[in-house]
Amino acid sequence: MKSFLLLLITCLFSRSAWTQSDVQKRYQTQLILADNGSTVNLDQGTFTFTGSLSLEDKKHIVIRGKGIDKTVLSFKGQTDGAEGLRVSNAEDIIIENLTIQDTKGDGIKTMNVKGITFRNVKVEWTGPPKADNGGYGLYPVQCDNVMIDGCTAIGASDAGIYVGQSRGIVVKNSQAYHNVAGIEIENSRNADVFNNEAYENTGGILVFDLPDLVQKQGGNVRVYNNYVHDNNLPNFAPEGNIVAGVSDGTGLLILAANRVEVFGNRFIRNQSVGTGIISYLITERPITDKGYYPFSSSISIHDNVYERDPGPPTSRGRFGKLFHSVLKFNQDIPHILYDGIADPSTLDKEGNPLPDRRICIRNNKNQSVANLDAGRGFQHVSRDAAPFNCQLDPLKITVGNDR
């Protein structure tokens, strides 16, 4: 009887080891052989991978686990590839109900996909925040019709939830924490970001337009009904990354973006900048892209709530250094900061912005504003909110919110 039990236990352990080592090959084979319109079901359990999984040139595929923290794909010992899962040149793909952990690079990257949905997906780096964590958690780039719903991103050294150079975007009902940037919309058009919680990041939400990218200018971005709080994590991005310049204590940062509407949000205990509106010129990085537009314009910030604990801002990051050495706001930091750098071609003869290119800030609880006059060396910093007391037409964005 004892010999039989020992044999049984040995067989069970051997089977377990075989399954764990074989599962990567099995899942990759399923992805390669999947017929258009099929579902790839992933088992419950924690599985360790040494290389990336990939799906290419497929249509109408569902990749489905058993649930967040029930199907866990761990890449902690990854030696081959960078992403955990990569999807490219595809159409109508759904990824749902799974967790990706500790990838060498990005968690899930989708590129050139028409119709991509992330639903109930978590991507995380399980150790402390550090520069050699992967850059992006969820990373759709150059995609159309992007839906991110009920997802979680933790520990990315760039952005937890990032949508770049894409069109027709919804990011909703999601959480991002312990990242450099919680949620980032970059060089993307027609985006709705709502009902999310971004907290304990360096910066909660970023809306950026950057040079030297295929899609030159984003716009039509709405950020609304989000809870953006306690984003005071020291910046741990690798040196040289654009987000390495984001000051800890940043709630929302709008950089060189146009046609952005921000409303119904709660910006709470972000100790440096509740909302910042800046030009790329303030970064002092060279611009060689002749098609790049480095100014922010047509920005509407209204009906938000701002709160901050008493105390000085951080001294880290570009804004932190400005606060301490140039602006000297001490503990009385305005919640909303505008660098004051405008495109001269958008100003009338009196130097005022044309009606459709204004920065409008109104009806915010605890509202306080400063124009930093950065273009003239911060000579005439103004805390007068009157020039921003205007109203732009609400943005109208048609994206697939019901997917």
Specify the residue positions occupied by each region the protein language model found.
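Sec-dependent N-terminal signal peptides
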Residues: 4-12
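Parallel beta-helix/beta-solenoid
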Residues: 35, 57-59, 68, 85, ...
